[in-house]
From Swiss-Prot:
It catalyses: L-threonylcarbamoyladenylate + adenosine(37) in tRNA = N(6)-L-threonylcarbamoyladenosine(37) in tRNA + AMP + H(+). Belongs to the KAE1 / TsaD family. One of its GO terms (biological process) is tRNA threonylcarbamoyladenosine modification. It is found in: Cytoplasm. This is tRNA N6-adenosine threonylcarbamoyltransferase. The gene is tsaD.
Amino acid sequence: MRVLGIETSCDETGVAVYDTEKGLLAHQLYSQVKLHADYGGVVPELASRDHVRKTLPLIKAALKEAGISHQQLDGIAYTMGPGLVGALLVGACIGRSLAFGWNLPAVGVHHMEGHLLAPMLEENQPEFPFVALLVSGGHTQLVQVKGIGDYHLLGESVDDAAGEAFDKTAKLMGLDYPGGPRLAALAEQGNSDRFTFPRPMTDRPGLNFSFSGLKTSAANTLAANDSDEQTLADIARAFEDAVVDTLVIKCRRALKETGYKRLVVAGGVSANKHLRAKLEALLEKQKGQIFYPRTEFCTDNGAMIALAGALRLEAGEREPLAVKTHPRWPMTDLKPMVNISDAV
């Protein structure tokens, strides 16, 4: 099955073509970082309007890259949620309209399921069951995964997501948007021994997270010290260490509670080199396996939507003609899949 995937949930326009026999045929991505930079964050109205301008040209480019015409597609998948409602509507309306005009089946995909399945775009694919750490600007969750659509939430952030905490702290430090990657880059120059921040909620049972207090700790430390480059780097390092250690501690607990030996890490923060190194060390110590997508598929992209959509379309799922979006959509609301082929 050959599927066109469309991702427009936030500030990236992603389009891809995925073939269940040949793998990824095309991948086109446009980032709105420059558009939102002057505002220090995503402006929903501007994001929606830019998706309107960019989605159709990217679809044409993806089909050209794949070397196919729309007549050679077998289905269309689009992000149905969660995300910014206006941005979601752009992708959903375009995807559903093209499916109707081209007489193709369509399916709406859960954005976070796309992230969770993104490692299946790689040659080294995880087998079920596994624990998934989904860590991004909007979500920080630990999920027990028994199969596609068979998800049990083990823990999540009770306030800020990890990526959100990175971005907010970077803004406090005066770093340009997008702040998270810039803070991580600055942290590489920092001394890990100068400052120490707490590891929130690791002193009690459970798998939930809390990162808003770390932002407060960083703000207090910034206010009490000089703002020279080395001090900022040291604070960035202490902040990153605290976030990464917290994530690693919770992953260790989740693996112990489930008895699983496989960990999938996905979402924008999964590209963090410090996080990857510490999680790899954890899984090596436990004689387990860790899986994550290549860096370009850690952030939002159309490839993960095309893959997830292809699996659901092959299993017989179809969307009605009505265009629906779910700006808020718990992943645990999804139903377990049946009749999944060996497409991946």
